[in-house]
């Protein structure tokens, strides 16, 4: 629903008022949040809660289905199969899986030798006609010894389809070959579930499963710290708006400017931008010779500094020398009262029980010992640490 032109085509009014873009986007977001934990949504439910209510038709309806699918939610019919309403948005042209198209992928997408070898390998499998596709589907449904062979033939004939779809998702944090592998798993699921009697081509049906497999893999694996699928969509939308505003304004847009375009509070924009940041490894090489790492230049504000550590050791040594000038009982009372040994300060009553005397007697011993320590001869070595 990013295009204002698409929204402008929606002429149906809600409750007699003009179309409310903000209310519609809020309803879509709420619906995605509700269905995300389940992983799928009924096509009839989408039509009732969003399409009919807000008058979403034609291209805007296709955009709605795509937005829901991009959030990692499968759109199914009442039988749990991919909805024909959602399938119409994913038609792949024959030219996109031709030999020429595969050559263009090699040219336009950054790929390594294993991918080139794979593309060369799948180029050996010919595309099949609609009649051949139907015969293979019938053989699969019939079962028997020929079913597995038919599944293999149908899958091999559509391996190029997976590559064509995976190309659209390159540059989103996963290697191109990994995208193809995830898409192939979606293709195998489509082969197992395809029913040619429903009236749509296998390529149309398979595209739905391939896209679902790839988008979910990106959400789960593309980042070091996993981000929920619905948040990935929000991040992508925000980045698109940020990029457009950068071109228009000639500078980085502020959170307020981005929020105005997205109908989002500036604080929420800042939160999403923070989530969108990729973590950086402390092992990242720094310098031309890569002889140091990022972690070498980051201060540890938790560990004690060498200066503080040295001062603490010297203070303890001086304190021990001063305490040695007291009687054993006076020294032990002060050590317990102020936690000089274990860091735990004891009450007068606790110390009294230890020495088998009253609280008042401990207080008197403590006062006498402190008075001794305040003598200039004893306190002078400690004043340098204050």
UniProtKB/Swiss-Prot annotation:
Which residue stretches belong to region Sigma-70 factor domain-3?
233-309
InterPro entries according to UniProt? RNA_pol_sigma-70_dom, RNA_pol_sigma70, RNA_pol_sigma70_r1_2, RNA_pol_sigma70_r2, RNA_pol_sigma70_r3, RNA_pol_sigma70_r4, RNA_pol_sigma_r2, RNA_pol_sigma_r3/r4-like
Q: Where is this region: Sigma-70 factor domain-2?
A: 154-224
Q: Where is this region: Sigma-70 factor domain-4?
A: 322-375
The residues that make up the annotated DNA-binding region are 348-367
Task: Tell me its family.
Answer: Belongs to the sigma-70 factor family. RpoD/SigA subfamily.
HAMAP family, per database record: Sigma70_RpoD_SigA (MF_00963)
Q: How does it assemble?
A: Interacts transiently with the RNA polymerase catalytic core.
* Name of the protein: RNA polymerase sigma factor SigA
Biological classification of the source: Bacteria, Bacillati, Bacillota, Bacilli, Lactobacillales
Gene name as annotated: sigA
